[in-house]
């Protein structure tokens, strides 16, 4: 065997080894290895096709006499090699075809699983996702979806396994890291959970806000876990307050007692809640459910026209919730995340009983003191109903009105609230417009200013401003409130100043509500130019700068008033002869 034949043989044997390895990898149970083998096979086939094309196009010319004649007969090794590669090519094409068919089936099973998941049939969803993975093993979304279903069934270990498989399919799968973070959090692997969430941020820095929330959840749960351990230790040691808290909750769990029995017991319990230990024991022994699920207590809350005893029960419960939630973020979470209690909080803020409204407002204001508390309110309460209730406090005393507007301000500064406000503005606008119909002589001026300032800040966003400017009733409300305040500029100076700021924003929107509206606004502002107040003067001029151009008539009125002066033509000097 000459050197060339030896070289061809070695090349053939090398190809056989490589192709054998590829076939073994394509039959691997690991979807990632399998996928890489398919890609490598396709690459080899493409190179082989290019080599064949070169051979077909190549022309050999040899004019030397001593060159031996070329044989047309291929060696046995070449024939075997080509036949083997042809077989591999055929197998790869068949596999590609089967893969396409299986992809269609896997997608259909994924959709079935999603439907079952949406209906709460998590076992069925898992079955469909598993069938999809039997068709195609390297579909990451099937793993992450199945992991989510396992999470719903509290099977956290299986969820983690599926997340690991998803990461083998795609090492940058943020959804897999998210579910891993949640599963580890449920298993109290706090440090591992944090690492999973931080990995999301490394992959996609744009998810910083979400990751911050996830990490905050880990911190809160770890803190709550430590609190419960300490509370258990104190209870086991026989500390009086710990034991008394537990015993009193057991007493209050008795059903079908008279309302005063519960009112008295709740008031005693409230007095006992002094430290974090008692707050934690209240949560650990299911205090929230014992109180809110009690049929007698529920009847007291649901009765429209409450008598003195029912009012006492409701007020005592609200004061208890304030005591157990003060500075305790986990208790706040347990209180607000329960759907029935979340609905109740928004409803009680509109109660006809003043004491109940006051205590509901105090509780919500307490929750809003922390970022997590504000997030709970925005995420779980009926914000439309809450907003309607808050603006209704403008008719109450200065203290209550200012407290309500303080809560409104705290929420309005949150980005999530602003997003919600913009998305739900058509439904919220009537409540906001009602503020402009307030009588400044009766309402708290400081609270009214605060509410209008919030509207001004929200109107800085173009889409929100567009909705406000397009609402004729809102524009007329601004004008009517301005007219009422002009009756005593000195008394309502702050209201006028704040209202002009809102109107300046509205005038950025073109076209205006109407030309008639713009003319009336201009006339009001022209009259305010006589004010001795620098702030009002500046803002009135600012509004005029945006409305004057809308009407020739108002420009003429401004000229007559001397606000706008005509440019005098310069006389040309005659040259001396």
From Swiss-Prot:
Gene Ontology terms: cellular component: centrosome; cytoplasm
Major localization class: cytoplasm
UniProt keyword annotation of Isomerase present: no
Protein location: Cytoplasm
Keywords associated with the record: Cilium biogenesis/degradation, Cytoplasm, Phosphoprotein, Repeat, TPR repeat
Transmembrane segments annotated in the record for this chain: none
Residue numbers of Phosphothreonine PTMs: 71
SUPFAM superfamilies from the UniProt entry: ARM repeat, TPR-like
TPR repeats, residue ranges: 106-139, 140-173, 174-207
InterPro entries to which the protein is assigned, alphabetical: ARM-like, ARM-type_fold, TPR-like_helical_dom_sf, TPR_rpt, TTC12
Gene Ontology terms describing biological process: axonemal dynein complex assembly; sperm axoneme assembly
Parts forming coiled coils: none
Function: Cytoplasmic protein that plays a role in the proper assembly of dynein arm complexes in motile cilia in both respiratory cells and sperm flagella.
PANTHER family: TETRATRICOPEPTIDE REPEAT PROTEIN 12
Protein name: Tetratricopeptide repeat protein 12
Species this chain originates from: Macaca fascicularis
Gene expressing this chain: TTC12
């Amino acid at each position: 065997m000459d050197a060339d034949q030896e070289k061809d043989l070695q090349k053939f044997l090398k190809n056989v080894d490589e192709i054998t390895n590829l076939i073994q990898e394509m039959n691997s149970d690991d979807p990632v290895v399998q996928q890489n083998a398919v890609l490598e096979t396709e690459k080899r086939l493409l190179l082989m096709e290019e080599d064949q094309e070169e051979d077909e196009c190549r022309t050999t010319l040899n004019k030397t006499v001593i060159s031996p004649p070329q044989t047309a007969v291929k060696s046995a090794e070449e024939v075997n090699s080509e036949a083997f590669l042809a077989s591999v090519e055929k197998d790869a094409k068949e596999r590609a075809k089967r893969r396409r068919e299986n992809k269609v089936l896997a997608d259909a099973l994924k959709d079935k699983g999603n439907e079952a998941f949406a209906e709460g049939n998590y076992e069925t969803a898992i079955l469909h996702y598993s069938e999809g993975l039997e068709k195609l093993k390297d579909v990451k979304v099937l793993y992450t979806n199945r992991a989510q279903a396992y999470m719903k069934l509290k099977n956290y270990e299986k969820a983690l396994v599926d997340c690991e498989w998803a990461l083998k399919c795609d090492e940058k799968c943020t959804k897999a890291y998210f579910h891993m973070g949640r599963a580890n959090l449920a298993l109290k692997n706090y440090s591992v959970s944090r690492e999973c969430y931080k990995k999301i941020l490394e992959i996609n820095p744009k998810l910083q806000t979400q990751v911050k929330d996830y990490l905050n959840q880990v911190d809160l749960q770890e803190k709550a876990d430590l609190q419960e351990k300490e509370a258990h230790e104190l209870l086991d040691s026989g500390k009086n307050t710990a034991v008394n808290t537990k015993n009193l909750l057991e007493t209050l769990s008795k059903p079908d007692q008279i309302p005063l029995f519960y009112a008295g017991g709740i008031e005693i319990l409230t007095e006992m809640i002094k430290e974090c230990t008692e707050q934690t024991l209240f949560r650990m022994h299911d205090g929230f459910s014992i109180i809110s699920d009690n049929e007698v207590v529920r009847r007291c809350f649901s009765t429209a026209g409450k008598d003195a005893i029912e009012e006492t029960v409701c007020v005592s419960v609200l004061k208890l919730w304030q005591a157990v939630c003060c500075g305790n973020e986990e208790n706040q979470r347990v209180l607000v995340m329960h759907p029935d209690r979340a609905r109740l909080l928004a409803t009680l803020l509109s109660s006809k009983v003043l004491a109940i409204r006051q205590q509901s407002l105090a509780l919500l204001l307490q929750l809003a003191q922390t970022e997590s508390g504000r997030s709970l309110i925005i995420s779980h309460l009926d914000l439309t109903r809450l907003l309607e209730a808050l603006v209704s406090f403008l008719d109450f005393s200065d203290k209550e009105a200012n407290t309500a507007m303080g809560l409104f301000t705290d929420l309005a500064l949150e980005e999530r609230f602003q997003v919600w406000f913009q998305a739900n503005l058509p439904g919220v606008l009537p409540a906001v417009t009602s503020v402009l119909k307030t009588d400044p002589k009766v309402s708290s001026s400081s609270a009214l200013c605060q509410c209008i300032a919030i509207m001004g800040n929200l109107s800085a966003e173009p889409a929100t401003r567009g909705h406000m400017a397009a609402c004729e009733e809102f524009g007329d409300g601004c004008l009517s409130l301005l007219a009422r305040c002009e009756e005593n500029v000195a008394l309502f100076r702050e209201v006028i100043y704040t209202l002009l700021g809102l109107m300046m924003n509205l005038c950025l929107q073109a076209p205006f509500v109407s030309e008639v509206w713009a003319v009336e606004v201009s006339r009001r502002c022209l009259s305010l130019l006589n004010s001795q107040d620098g702030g009002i003067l500046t803002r009135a001029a600012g509004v005029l700068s945006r409305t004057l151009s809308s009407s020739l008539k108002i420009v003429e009125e401004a000229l007559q008033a001397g606000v706008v002066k005509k440019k005098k033509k310069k006389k040309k000097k005659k040259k001396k002869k």
